[in-house]
């Protein structure tokens, strides 16, 4: 999350983590749940960041569906915020998507296979 804008009238909160295929209601609910959990646990805020965040060595969100699925399934916060039925439902959807992806033969694999013959 970051504040962006050049004047008090144009300042807004931005979260560029969710993908374009996210359910916006679930994304906002997750952000609120995470914020409330941080407040309840009295977690300290990180210092304000300046510079290019893409070059920062700070914590990262999962970069693959497989690693995101593992984090989602193991998240006590997600289960508390959404309930186990919702977590399990979306986890199953991710597993189905991963199975379809794993079964696909890509152009790279075909090309590489022909190179090796």
Segments predicted by a language model, with ranges:
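Catalytic-core signal marking the mid-to-C-terminal active-site face
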Residues: 1-117
């Amino acid at each position: 999350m970051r504040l962006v804008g050049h004047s008090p009238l144009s300042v807004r909160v931005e979260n560029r983590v969710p993908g374009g295929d996210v359910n916006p209601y679930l994304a906002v609910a997750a952000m609120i749940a995470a914020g409330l959990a941080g407040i309840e646990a009295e977690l300290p805020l990180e210092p304000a960041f300046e510079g290019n965040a893409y070059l920062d060595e700070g914590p990262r969100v999962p970069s693959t569906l497989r690693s995101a699925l593992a984090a989602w399934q193991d998240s006590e916060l997600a289960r508390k915020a959404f309930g186990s039925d919702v977590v399990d439902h979306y986890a199953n959807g991710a597993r189905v998507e991963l199975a379809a992806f794993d079964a696909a033969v890509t152009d790279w694999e075909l090309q590489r296979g022909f190179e090796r013959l």
